[in-house]
A protein has these predicted regions:
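Beta-sandwich interaction modules
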Residues: 168-195
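Extended, low-complexity segments enriched in Ser/Thr/Gly and acidic residues that occur primarily
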Residues: 1-132, 136-175, 199-212, 217-220
Length: 220
């Protein structure tokens, strides 16, 4: 990761050298963007967590991601995308409600995520670094598909709905990769500090359909 490492006084004839770019005969100052923690935009090590497909179900626990004490990392959730399956001949009558929670304990049961697997839809889902030069995940950062226990809910954050229809002409086709945390891209990041995590859980109303998820997160 990179952080801004200097500041300069913009005083003609003194100070550090400022990078510029010549455009149409004029020099324009070249800049890089930094966030509120001094991280250079685009420099944080990023990872994907892609899950298998599963049939939806009332109150189903889909996935939890946990950042255990001692990981030495702060996790920022950049997006959680719902991906309804459109290659199954099934028509859903109801939309599916997905709730996002903060958790205070790691999930149990289910299947732990694989790391850099070459198998599509591997059991437990698969975590991949965006850049192969990224460091391996700390042992304290884990993901679990279909946990059956643990994942103690500490806070309800919000809910969203996605269609359950699975034909190519349905709303499920139109809303592929629906991000359920878009409002957080304009303010603070959805930050997961040590000894906390997130959980995606279906609402109490039964529905039909099959779905998977894609989570993108960064570490700092």
């Amino acid at each position: 990761m990179s952080q801004a490492n200097d500041s300069i006084l913009v005083t003609p004839g003194s100070g550090a050298t400022v990078a510029t770019e010549l455009i149409n005969g004029k020099e324009y100052q070249a800049v890089v963007l930094a966030d509120n923690q001094g991280q250079i935009h685009g420099s944080l090590e990023s990872y994907y967590y892609a899950t298998p497909t599963v049939a939806v179900g009332a109150s189903k626990l889909y996935l939890d991601i946990f950042n255990a004490t001692g990981s030495g990392k702060i996790m920022d959730i950049r997006g959680i995308w719902i991906i309804p399956a459109t290659d199954v001949a099934l028509t859903g009558a109801l939309g599916v409600r997905y709730d996002l929670y903060r958790t205070s304990a790691i999930g149990t049961g289910g299947t732990a995520a694989a790391y850099k697997s070459a198998t599509p839809d591997v059991a437990g889902g698969n975590i991949n670094p965006v850049d192969t030069n990224n460091a391996n995940l700390p042992a304290g950062i884990t993901a679990r598909w279909l946990p059956t226990g643990g994942a103690t809910i500490a806070q309800w954050l919000f809910a969203t709905y996605a269609p359950g229809e699975e034909t190519a002409t349905s709303m499920a086709h139109i809303t592929q990769y629906q991000n359920i945390v878009p409002v957080l891209t304009v303010g603070q990041k959805l930050t997961i500090r040590e000894n906390s995590g997130i959980l995606v859980k279906q609402g109490t109303v039964a529905a039909t359909g099959n779905t998977k998820f894609l989570v993108i997160f960064t570490l700092e």
